[in-house]
Amino acid sequence: MVSLRDNIEAQPLSHNRRIRKNFGHINLVADIPNLIEIQKNSYEKNFLQLNIKDSERKNKGLQSILNSIFPISDSSNVANLEFVKYEFDTPKYDVEECSQRSLSYAAPLKVTLRLSIWDIDEDTGTREIKGIKEQEVYMGDIPLMTKNGTFIINGTERVVVSQMHRSPGVFFYHDEGKVHSSGKLLYSARVIPYRGSWLDLEFDAKDVIYFRIDRKRKLYATTLLRAIGMSTEEIIKFYYNSVTYKLVKNKGWAVKFIPQHITAHRLTSDLVDADTGNILLKAGQKITPRLAKKYFGEGLNNILVAHETLIGKYLSEDLRDPASDEVLAKIGEMITADMLNVINDLKIKNVNVLVINPQSGPYIRNTLFADKNQDREAALCDIFRVLRPGEPANIEAAESLFYNLFFDTERYDLSEVGRIKMNSRLELNISEEVTVLTIDDIKNIVRVLVELKDGKGIIDDIDHLGNRRVRSVGELIENQFRIGLVRMEKSVIERMSAGDVDTVMPHDLVNSKILVSVVKEFFSTSQLSQFMDQTNPLSEITHKRRLSALGPGGLSRDRAGFEVRDVHPTHYGRICPIETPEGQNIGLINSMATYARINKHGFIESPYRRVKDGCVTDEVVYLSAIEEGKYKIGQANSKINKDGKLQGEFINCRVEGGNFVMVEPYEVDFIDVTPMQVVSVAASLIPFLENDDANRALMGSNMQRQAVPLIKTDAPFVGTGVEGVVAKDSGASVLALHDGIVEQVDSNRIVIRTLEQKVDGSPSVDIYNLLKFQKSNHNTCINQKPLVKVGHYVKKNDIIADGPSTDNGEIALGRNVLVAFLPWNGYNFEDSILISERIVKEDVFTSIHIEEFEVIARDTRLGPEEITRDIPNVSEEALRHLDEVGIIYIGAEVKAGDILVGKVTPKSESPITPEEKLLRAIFGEKAFDVKDSSLHVPSGVSGTVVEVRVFSRRGVEKDQRAIAIEKQQIEKFAKDRDDELEIIEHFVFSWLEKLLVGQVIINGPKQVKVGQTITTEMLKGLSKGQFWQITVEDANVMNEIEQIKTHYDEKKEALDKRFATKVEKLQSGDDLPQGALKVVKVFIATKHKLQPGDKMAGRHGNKGVISRIVPEEDMPFLEDGTVVDIVLNPLGLPSRMNIGQILETHLGWASINLAKKISTLVKEYKNKHIGIEQIKKFLIELYGENINSILERPEEEIIAFCKKVSKGVHFATPVFDGAKVQDVKDMLKLAGQDPSGQVKLIDGRTGEYFDRLVTVGQKYLLKLHHLVDNKIHSRSIGPYSLVTQQPLGGKSHFGGQRFGEMECWALQAYGAAYTLQEMLTVKSDDVNGRIKTYDSIVRGENNFESGIPESFNVMIKEFRSLCLNVKLEVTSS
């Protein structure tokens, strides 16, 4: 068999990877987890369980919903519909086809259902099975996720954002003293289920406990306890301890001495030992808990108390007459003076009372006695009356309602998470499968609430990440599915009851439209299903990792207070403290930290390295916020020696509550994996983040997401080392699926022969079709370009093509430019930016934007609209770009007003005059009237047509253009098929050749003789088809040839079949919206060069608008003649405190000067002045150990590497672990520059030096998506507002600029009366005046008269609504 590695080039593709000089000191033990796996795991693994066999599916997601809804039975229990299994068919169209045809990328869900029909004997009631029918039922199309974690809905890419919500369970809190005027803390508890009714328990100002269900009217908490079946005695016994007072003749009562119940106070009577009679402390002396413990230790068991001490205590059991056993007082009653006399008279020796003291208050006893309900029935009826006011309360209805509220699995679900949280908070041990409330839960919630009131325990922190969980895509859609299936269940039951069950089949019962509409509604309209932010790859990744507290079941902006929005200590390593929007959503929309992941319960986990006996191991453990509270966790930058031991006497550690403590090394449990785990992906791309103010860092991370992909990409010289990970995980770059060898490359596709062999030993072929000039959601350009050459050997997951904003597999959002910090004639006032003409001339910041325009030809009442070139009253000049069908050519340069697609619409006929009638009678029928309804280029748009798509309805004849596009597409499919076949044929026939050479022929084509031994030359004379006709002696060889032939034929057939399917799909016509016959989409690409008014920004929150483009000769320049590209204002720094940008500039300055140094060394090497050793020495000095892999290679590869860094050396300075000021100085020294990073600069206009040294360096700048071209517009005439008759505002309404109150003051100040008058009248809302003005302008006159503005009339009308009549009375003078 032929070796597949026979022509592998020595140099694998991984040698192309960019090497960065890394300033980080902390070794990474864990890689950054895939950045979009949150989305994919949640939907594909947990919800759909896509590629899992039916028998192996876990009971979660779709499986669990179907299991919980089915079986469905009809009311008489005759028919029973059960769920067997589900599976997905392959989607009809792939991702690309769906986006082009405006369809949803979805797969049909097929559910196998079994309908069992029973025969019921009416006399005995026994059931016998009558028949079973099993059938696969179509339940609608379920959207699938693309490989990048997005959904395609109606042709647009959308993302479902994960939601943060309060975890189900029980929460205890107080009102912080805000409700009652005295400032008393009122405690409350709330049970939040995953779905079902909320239960609240609360104290009022009088310390009585109430409960409410779903925030309805409140009832006494003891009513709830009675409703769950507790009697008065059980309630009192459960919540209180009791103590017995024994009568001691003539002395008082002896009672057990319990030191725990003693608080520090002065005694009102003597403390007497009841057993010995000794007085231990006199009245008026102070007793403390410490003293009490001492006496107890010395043997004090019982103390003597005065007779009247019992007054005010509460009975812990019924008080009975010893003689007659008659009940004298009920349990819980207070002992009064009268009752004490009765006790004395009847000589009752023992009285049991409740232990009520400052540590346990009488709240439940007081509530019991305030509550009128004395038994379970009354309590249930009371609850029924509150929840169903106006309905007659009977015990059955009340019991059923109460059961359904909290104890019925169909209506109440705590979820597994809720049960775990409930168990841990109430210290219970109930099985996790019990997801409804239990009697123990309710009893213990009241217990914990009372304990809180008594000062035991602490309230819950709602913003703690142990109490907030994340609902990802899978779970959100699961909830929608449940809603849809519950609705469907009702319709199934109706259909079962309505029809003849014997003849009905499962598909007759199921109406899938209900389910489909619910899912569709979620994806199209839900607040959490959002149009993907596709400005650049970083914005895509950030959008998928976003956590929103808003949305259904979440918070609303207006109600969210400061606490919810604030950073919480548990956010550490889970949620980024930096990246969040400015404005009303601040803190409600967050981003997940780089290393964070979500566990199966929906809590966010962060990774830590385990520390054993003060030794840091490489074991990485993920902890949630709750688990983390149990440990002491050190920082990632704790000093560690060579053996991995923590150095130093004390280590600074985080403990529960976000506090820091100093502990000895052996006490540390974990340390952070890396300092970068604190921040999000966007923030981790900012070098020197640690030197920036947090507000500016927030702006920096937000503005990186608005950077427009440029034509020429350029990775930052000063990066953080995360750039590669972002580019790879975003899906912008193309990754190799398997190891292989590049067979073909052009700008549109890459063909790779894989090295992973199939069972038959033949290679498979991977064809990567690259995206060329596609429009993103935000009209930026998606374009991929190959990085590989023919013959390259690629490994799985190598980057083989760059996408938008990526450079050699690293994210590249902007460009490196030479920046000087210096004021320049006021042109950089208020953060304005001054740029050199070179930037524009060399297209440094030029970007391509693509706009899509669509025209639909519909079938109207008067006849069909037609796409045509024959348009009435249009000059030939206007049609110059259209083909014979009336559609614009690709490559045409268009500007505003040009026709893109010619279209005519039938016009309703006007009444015919007698003359016309006569002419028609003579000259025959004239064609019906049509009006021009062509698609024109809107104002403000110009560019080149890059793509045209034509879609025709099924059954409508295709026009020439559609056929041409189709033909082009078929040729592309054929080329893919032929190339794949060619690679397989090459392999198969070279293998055949190896088998046949040296064999003896028994039979074969005419050219060969029987008995001959086969040689290579002989085979060269045969055609490929004749190889199969040869028969040889060796039976084993013949068997092998047979197998190869079979595999080859199968492969060929599969390829032909795939090709035929694609062609058939292409030719079959399209599913267009109702009434549409043809749809034409035209894409126009516009090149946006940088111009004044465009917004630019750095990565440190330093943003500004371009004020002027200066000729190169006028810009400041360096002593060697290099012209500065951009001049920034130094005043933008001190107040904003983003010093990171200065350090970046200095390191960038070192970068280009080091590159110059390397280039000089290479030049000298080529001139034979120095050897390769000097270059190696310099590279080691610069890069350290990173460079060893390069230095081991041949000399020419080292020189090739040096050429790659000739523009600038790339640095990585990781967040919080990067270069310090000294490192930057060292690099400047190594580059031969002044350590201050400042240089002498010459003014381009005068040719003189500036007075002071200027900070100059390479800085990474971004062009943001706020382009002046999209903002500026002008209005000539346009629409007016209906009521005020003033022009509308805004570009989209073609509106005017508002001349407001302050602007009027300005004209008043200058006394410009006539200008002011025309502003307020004819240019605004004087309707008659503006019509007359328009007339006079048309006639070429310049006079106008202004009348009364409409807003004055509106004001008069408003006065009239207040019954005030304003009249203008002219009095004669």
From Swiss-Prot:
Q: InterPro entries, per this entry? A: DNA-dir_RNA_pol_bsu_ext_1_sf, DNA-dir_RNA_pol_bsu_external_1, DNA-dir_RNA_pol_su2, DNA-dir_RNAP_su2_dom, DNA-dir_RNAP_su2_hyb_sf, RNA_pol_bsu_bac, RNA_pol_bsu_CS, RNA_pol_bsu_protrusion
Protein task = DNA-dependent RNA polymerase catalyzes the transcription of DNA into RNA using the four ribonucleoside triphosphates as substrates.
Q: Which PROSITE patterns match?
A: RNA_POL_BETA
- The Enzyme Commission number assigned here is 2.7.7.6
Taxonomic lineage of the native organism: Bacteria, Pseudomonadati, Pseudomonadota, Alphaproteobacteria, Rickettsiales
Catalytic activity reads: RNA(n) + a ribonucleoside 5'-triphosphate = RNA(n+1) + diphosphate
Gene Ontology cellular component? Answer: DNA-directed RNA polymerase complex
Originating species: Rickettsia rickettsii (strain Sheila Smith)
Q: Which GO terms describe its biological process?
A: DNA-templated transcription
Self-association and partners: The RNAP catalytic core consists of 2 alpha, 1 beta, 1 beta' and 1 omega subunit. When a sigma factor is associated with the core the holoenzyme is formed, which can initiate transcription.
Listed A to Z, the keywords are: DNA-directed RNA polymerase, Nucleotidyltransferase, Transcription, Transferase
Q: Which Gene3D superfamilies match?
A: 2.40.50.100, 2.40.50.150, 3.90.1100.10, DNA-directed RNA polymerase, beta subunit, external 1 domain (2.30.150.10), DNA-directed RNA polymerase, subunit 2, domain 6 (2.40.270.10), RNA polymerase alpha subunit dimerisation domain (3.90.1800.10)
Q: Which CDD domains match?
A: RNA_pol_B_RPB2
The family assignment reads:
Belongs to the RNA polymerase beta chain family.
This one is known as DNA-directed RNA polymerase subunit beta
Gene coding for it: rpoB
Which Pfam family is an annotated match for this chain, by its short name?
RNA_pol_Rpb2_1
Single GO MF descriptor: ribonucleoside binding
